[in-house]
């Protein structure tokens, strides 16, 4: 390998590791977001889905190690440190294997996540209290208000709640209440509301002034959109990792041959 080719390889490897470092930060940030988000469907899933939490911690670990390896790769490439490049290659290969494993698990557990979300939402609805004081009740109120939906499949899911089931007045979940289209300010109401102009003798969902759509389809679209973005980022990182592996091998072989040529021969 000529000196000019080696120089190009060094700086290409440096550039790839810089991108690698940035994408590692994105993966780490995604894992932190899964754990910290309290205002979307993720916050509802966290209460029951251990697989989602495990996946989040894996993303944080992989992202942190990826950033470290990107840093080591930059130093090893610029200074031609063979031991650093070898260490970089080994860890990069392990990261790639772990990353592919997590992606496969997320892909094949998509239906399980959807089922877990449905079970969690129905449990929240059935046990929803008048004060709505728990974190998961507050999270579901936020979801219904933000996405403009009510219940899981439909608003009638709320009839399983004892408070609404036993009410003789037109009582409904406040976070489901319809808002004016021109009102862009998000106001999240909690608990149950009573209709002022109620004339019905029983509490029927048909009489509720709420959004008619359930949240299931919107939740599925949300999951597909966000996990699609995640898989796209991970695929981009995987391509950079493969290029990094190839370039690190080339540079390691060159450094080894250069060191060997400097050994005096008798």
Curated annotation (Swiss-Prot):
It is a multi-pass membrane protein. A lipid is attached at residues 5, 74 (S-palmitoyl cysteine). Palmitoylated. Palmitoylation contributes to oligomerization and surface expression. Glycans are attached at residues 127, 131, 157, 166, 197. Residues 1-11, 73-83, 250-266 are cytoplasmic. It is found in: Cell membrane. Structural component of specialized membrane microdomains known as tetraspanin-enriched microdomains (TERMs), which act as platforms for receptor clustering and signaling. Participates thereby in diverse biological functions such as cell signal transduction, adhesion, migration and protein trafficking. Acts as a attenuator of EGF signaling, facilitating ligand-induced endocytosis of the receptor and its subsequent desensitization. Mechanistically, modulates ligand-induced ubiquitination and trafficking of EGFR via E3 ligase CBL phosphorylation by PKC. This is CD82 antigen. It comes from Rattus norvegicus (Rat).
């Amino acid at each position: 390998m000529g000196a000019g080719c080696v120089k190009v390889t060094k700086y290409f490897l440096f550039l790839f590791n810089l991108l690698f470092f940035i994408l590692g930060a994105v993966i780490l940030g995604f894992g932190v977001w899964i754990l910290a988000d309290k205002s979307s469907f993720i916050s509802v899933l966290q209460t029951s889905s251990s697989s989602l939490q495990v996946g989040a911690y894996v993303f944080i670990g992989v992202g942190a190690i990826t950033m470290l390896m990107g840093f080591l790769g930059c130093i090893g490439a610029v200074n031609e440190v063979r031991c650093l490049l070898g260490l970089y290659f080994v860890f990069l290969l392990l990261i790639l294997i772990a990353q592919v494993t997590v992606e496969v698990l997320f892909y094949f557990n998509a239906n399980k996540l959807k089922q877990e979300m449905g079970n969690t939402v129905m449990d929240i609805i059935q046990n929803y209290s008048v004060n709505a004081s728990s974190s998961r009740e507050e999270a579901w109120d936020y979801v219904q208000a933000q996405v403009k939906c009510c219940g899981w499949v439909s608003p009638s899911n709320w009839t399983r709640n004892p408070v609404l089931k036993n009410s003789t007045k037109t009582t409904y979940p406040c976070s489901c209440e319809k808002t004016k289209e021109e009102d862009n300010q998000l106001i999240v109401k909690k608990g149950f509301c009573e209709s002022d102009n109620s004339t019905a003798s029983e509490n029927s969902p048909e009489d509720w002034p709420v959004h008619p759509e359930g949240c299931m389809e919107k939740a599925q679209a949300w999951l597909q959109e966000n996990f699609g973005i995640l898989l796209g980022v991970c695929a981009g990182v995987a391509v950079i990792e493969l290029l990094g592996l190839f370039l690190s091998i080339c540079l390691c072989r060159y450094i080894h041959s250069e060191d060997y040529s400097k050994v005096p021969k008798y």
